[in-house]
């Protein structure tokens, strides 16, 4: 029989480990505890952001449940960066970098302390992939607990969320919103704890993790402030102890087939473009053969059947009341769009977990549709290629009346310069804004362009202006926007060669992104291009810029270490 403390006994057994045990006695351990599995609780609690401000009660619930199930809990902290607070500033360069820092920090504690399992608890966007990357890397029994979504805010009879505040900025600058109402939206958009409420990045990733089998059923759409979130966390910890007993590990669950399940659900719920980047990183950590083209393969066969913000109507709390991710998965499973034989952290297969879920969503809800009445017949996250991005880039094509545009390039070498032009109302109908040198290496850190895209939407230009960047977009972004352009400008990608006024085409139907300049002229510009000096030469951002892979491979830091 497998010993449940197979790893932790490396630091607790034998005469030579007397000093190690002394450290444990100092924090309240008793001799009987050294035969128990030692389970980490990676706690993302923080008073920095509402996304993480409600996590301590979940971490406490996990500790209590672990101890009650015969394990010994070891809580440690993981960092977080608030995208909503850093957005539009230099601080946003640390957001994607924090994904790597979170993965590294969890790996450090789990392996450095020989833990036998780990409960990862996170809230804000990069907590999600960072934690899952660590689970895939370490491959010790683990489970992901999402901190839960925020509830909607309210102002003058309207439901609000954080994107309402970003879009209000553009409405105010264009004279469409009063200063009083701007303040009203600002003060009521986020009413309490929990992650941003639409199908933005955090809720996209939590939904995907449930579909992946690494989180409990229904857990991904619960509100942080509801009692069921604490109860689900308790259950998650108990389930993890059972997984330790069964030696059920992340890589038994995270397989190519389960990744296909997760991406299918991302398409069905209308999830964030960031999911493409993050699942490239997760599959890299799990050593699964997965490329950016696999997203396009799945997009073509999975329709969008959930009507969610930012381009739709509803929030995660509405989805939860309508049946949650299990209802979405059951619809897909019945049509052969999911692999029912994939294992989950519960010890049951996907098909077994969904056995009692109705095949048809409730008639009294409007959030989840049936496959014969989808919002869109194909998925929404399209991979475009062309001379601007031969490696591929990502666009979200839901909510658009016309998913193609050809127009003059308005070129900016940073988000800040582009934002200044937008706020000064210098961008007009038909323009294509190009924001470059914001990629993994050039930014560094691939800032999210929620501020400029929301300002454009607020000014009424969301349908008539295109935007191309080697940076990223928030899960709250919608419009004719294309991100993750690779190769990026900093390494000499074609996006670096676009001149002000050049004709550029974005065509989501043809999956095309093209600089309409002849090859000879592009070659001439390429020969004259010189790489700019790095923006940082010391510290974390400099390290990330040095190590980061191309966006088409997830912008990870451990991919090319042997090159």
Swiss-Prot record:
Binds 1 [2Fe-2S] cluster per subunit. This cluster acts as a Lewis acid cofactor. It is an enzyme of class 4 (lyase). It holds the Pfam family ILV_EDD_C. Gene3D superfamilies: IlvD/EDD C-terminal domain-like. InterPro entries: DHAD_IlvD/Edd, Dihydro-acid_dehy_C, DihydroxyA_deHydtase, DiOHA_6PGluconate_deHydtase_CS, ILV_EDD_C, ILV_EDD_N, IlvD/EDD_N. The keyword Metal-binding applies. [2Fe-2S] cluster binds at residues 51, 124, 196. Keywords: 2Fe-2S, Amino-acid biosynthesis, Branched-chain amino acid biosynthesis, Iron, Iron-sulfur, Lyase, Magnesium, Metal-binding. One of its GO terms (molecular function) is magnesium ion binding. The active site is at residue 474. Belongs to the IlvD/Edd family. This is Dihydroxy-acid dehydratase. The lineage of its organism: Bacteria, Pseudomonadati, Pseudomonadota, Betaproteobacteria, Burkholderiales.
């Amino acid at each position: 029989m497998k010993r449940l403390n197979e790893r932790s006994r490396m630091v607790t057994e034998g005469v030579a480990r007397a000093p190690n045990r002394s450290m444990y006695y100092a924090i309240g351990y008793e001799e009987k505890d050294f035969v128990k599995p030692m389970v980490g609780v990676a706690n993302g609690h923080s008073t920095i952001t509402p996304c993480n401000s409600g996590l301590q009660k979940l971490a406490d619930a996990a500790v209590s449940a672990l101890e009650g199930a015969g394990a010994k809990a070891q809580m440690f902290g993981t960092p977080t960066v608030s995208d909503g607070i850093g957005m539009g500033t230099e601080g946003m360069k640390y957001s994607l970098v924090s994904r790597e820092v979170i993965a590294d920090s969890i790996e450090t504690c789990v392996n450095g302390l020989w833990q036998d399992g780990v409960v990862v608890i996170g809230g804000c966007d990069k907590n999600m992939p960072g934690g899952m990357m660590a689970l895939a890397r370490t491959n010790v029994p683990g489970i992901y607990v999402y901190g839960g979504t925020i509830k909607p805010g309210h102002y003058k009879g309207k439901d609000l969320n954080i994107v309402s505040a970003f879009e209000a900025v553009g409405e105010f600058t264009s004279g469409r919103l009063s200063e009083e109402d701007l303040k009203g939206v600002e003060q009521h958009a986020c009413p309490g704890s929990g992650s941003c409420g639409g199908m933005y990045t955090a809720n996209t990733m939590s939904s995907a993790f449930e579909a992946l089998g690494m989180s409990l059923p229904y857990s991904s759409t619960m509100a942080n402030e509801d009692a069921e979130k604490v109860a689900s966390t308790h259950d998650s910890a108990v389930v993890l102890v059972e997984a330790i007993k069964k030696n059920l590990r992340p890589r038994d669950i995270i397989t190519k087939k389960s990744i296909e399940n997760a991406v299918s659900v991302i398409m069905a719920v209308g999830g964030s473009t960031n999911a493409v980047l993050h699942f490239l990183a997760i599959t890299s950590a799990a050593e699964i053969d997965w490329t950016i083209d696999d997203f396009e393969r799945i997009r073509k066969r999975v329709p969008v059947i959930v009507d969610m913000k930012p381009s739709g109507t509803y929030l995660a709390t509405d989805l939860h009341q309508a049946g949650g991710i299990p209802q979405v998965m059951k619809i897909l499973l019945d049509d052969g769009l999911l692999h029912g034989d994939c294992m989950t952290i519960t010890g049951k297969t996907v098909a077994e977990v969904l056995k009692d879920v109705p095949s048809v969503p409730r008639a009294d809800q409007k959030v989840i549709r049936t496959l014969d009445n989808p919002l869109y017949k194909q998925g929404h996250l399209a991979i475009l290629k062309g001379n601007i991005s031969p490696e591929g880039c990502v666009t979200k094509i839901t909510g658009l009346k016309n998913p193609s545009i050809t127009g003059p390039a308005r070129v900016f070498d940073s988000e800040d310069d582009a934002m200044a032009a937008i706020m000064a109302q210098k961008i007009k109908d038909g323009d294509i804004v190009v924001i470059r040198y914001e990629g993994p290496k050039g930014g560094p850190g691939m800032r999210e362009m929620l501020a400029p895209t929301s300002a454009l939407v607020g000014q009424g230009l969301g349908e008539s202006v295109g935007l191309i960047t080697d940076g990223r977009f928030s899960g709250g972004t919608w419009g004719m926007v294309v991100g993750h352009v690779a190769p990026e400008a900093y390494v000499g990608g074609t996006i670096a060669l676009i001149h002000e006024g050049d004709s550029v085409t974005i065509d989501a139907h043809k999956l095309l992104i093209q600089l309409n300049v002849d090859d000879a002229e592009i070659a001439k510009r390429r020969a004259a291009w010189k790489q700019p000096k790095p923006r940082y030469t010391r510290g974390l951002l400099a390290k990330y810029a040095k190590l980061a892979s191309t966006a088409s491979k997830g912008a990870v830091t451990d991919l090319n270490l042997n090159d």
